[in-house]
Amino acid sequence: MKLILLGAPGAGKGTQAEILCRELSIPTISTGNILRAAIKNGTPTGLKAKSYMDAGQLVPDDVIIGIVTERLAEDDCKNGYIQDGVPRTIAQAAALEKAGITFDDVISIEISDETIMERMSGRRVCESCGASYHMVAVPPKQEGVCDKCGGKLVQRKDDAPETVKARLEVYHKETEPLKDFYAQRGLLKPVENQPSVEETSRAILHALGR
């Protein structure tokens, strides 16, 4: 089974990818991870990507698609995979198609901007031990203090409301159109975000006929 997980930042794609990876016994192909691995291993596309990154430039789509294609050709992807991080745009989706990379299903986790703002802006992390909290869902016993080590709890820059809002704007402009792209191909399966991680996982598996 070859899957794409779509959803706004904060929709829980990474968490759901981990669960699906276990349930379906297929690997999650994270674009960030395979990009770093390609650079570390010195592959031709990895070296090309590194040249752009060293110059402080964005890695072009054709290089990203090349790295993804290399990774999907490995043995552990023969029975399927969960694609995470690419495509982010219509151009990338079209490039994947042109490269002969196909998918069986595209899951879109549906969640409101308001819920995402609440979810992400409530996150706190211990600057000493890295433990994670949420001011509503998993609050610390003492506000601003880590239960585990007594360290200071801080809000990451990525979780600040203004940053979250900016990321959502980019998602709606560049990535959300992929839903129509894959709906036209009969691949899109929208799944409503549920109150718990487990319920969302069950809804995704149900949409996949599992």
Predicted feature descriptions by range:
Residues M1-R210:
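Glycine-rich phosphate-binding loop of ATP-dependent small-molecule kinases
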